[in-house]
Amino acid sequence: MSSSSIHSLTGAPPVASAALAAHGKRITSIDALRGLVMCIMMMDHVRETLYLHHQVGDPMDISHTPPFLFFTRLAAHFCAPIFVFLTGLGAWLYANPPGAPPRSAREFLLKRGALLIFLEIFVMSFLWVGQWPEKVWLQVLWVIGFSMIVLAFASGLPRKVLLVAGLLIVGTHNLFTSIALPPDHPMHALWTLFMHRDVLFDTVPQVRVTYPAWPWVGVIFLGWCAGPIFARGFDSARRRKLLVLMGAGCWLALLVLRGFNIYGENTPWTHWPTTVQTVMDFLNYTKYPPSLDFLLMAVGGGCFVLAAIDQADNAFTRFMSTFGGAPMFYYLLHLAVLITGYKLLLAVFGPNQVSSSGVERFGVGPDQFWIVWVVTVLMWFVLYYPTKWFGGFKRRTTIGWVKYF
């Protein structure tokens, strides 16, 4: 287990190496889950590289989204909520090292949160398109960074207060997400940052918010509150039982709320001509911002996986832990490889697809969508050894800034 395996996207710091090592396989399960969702995330990014000419909506349009595309996109829905949940969990582990008094996580959260926002604005937008973009998108790194900054100031509150706050935020934000304020409204900028996906600054470059922050703050609070069950000395059987109960509670609430179209998703599901389409509609949730149903599905699934791999040590957990142990390096590297590969393919073969907006791109057609899955698996193995090397280098080095990656 590396000293920084939980720091970059999740919030455990490099200085906590002794603390994290003492948690042993429990922390390995966290790394493995993070690595798993990052591998799934790559599949979605490969899709966006090779199949961007076929845009998917939010929520998706069932009548124009074939099942292979729907379920590929649906799998990626688990990634961001689990990232943010593990961010809070990792921050709690830092603040409560085993065998030592509790310590403040404020400075750690502030520094890493600010770094993630910086990377989102000045690095990620470039990596997505391979040039300085006309639009800057505030996406997952921005919202993780912002949530970390909020948690930095809230982490001194009693855990019960954060638990209630997290539940209230996650449970009630759906009441307000359909409200859109016009650009000339004095509260438009704040509303866009926190609640509604929109243009933040209509400048050059234009700044757009993809991930409104408010519901994600609730998720990071809940992750922090889950931290104690991963403390050293916590009975592993009891931890697995609690994780299963948490996952079952999330999915049971989802089945009731979604099944009866009570609350939690602004778009109700209906019966379609085929069973597959009906299932797709039932699972068709809003991501930007995440609906309550979206979060229940993803966080509940994450709890089940954590329970299943708790204290596991096998080829699967070791493979996934490699990616989860150096998450920022892996994240930046996979985007750099994808955009470089795309530019080469475009230069060699030229554009062969046209989007609905008339933009010509290189890509694969519906009959070749399997290439997206094959490229994803190949990318896992291409990036495995560089990520493993960097994880080892990060553990050995005394260079301070390397620990942030």
Predicted regions and their residues:
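Alpha-helical transmembrane segments and their immediate juxtamembrane cytosolic regions
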Residues: 2-405
